[in-house]
Amino acid sequence: PSKAKATLKAVRTQFPDYKLVAILELHTFSSLNKEFIPQYRNVLDAADEAIVFFNKHTLEIKRMPDLEPEYIRSSFARKDLLVFRENSELERYLTDLRRARTVILFMSSGTFNGLNIRTWATENHF
């Protein structure tokens, strides 16, 4: 959580007049742990729009219980938090974003379940 918060703060400082969309992937065993997730409270507060992504299949592989989007929102203390469990849904949502003066910050120790961010950005003229 501290790395994500510091990264978000640095990007906000660098782009103060831009809309900042922060996307955090929960990927590691600890970040997907229901008892650990509340440590992310207020981590994404500096973002104008905040998104959490995790892949249900990753939970299954790690034999962890499913996480409900409402639990994620509550843990992050952000009612407007968007939660995506499929990278295709995330990709569709991001493609529809207004792009003028918008910074999209991807934060993960994973791969957003194989989402090719560079290809997506090129195809969508980011």
Task: Tell where the protein language model's regions lie, with residue ranges.
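ATP-dependent carboxylate-amine ligase
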Residues: P1-F126
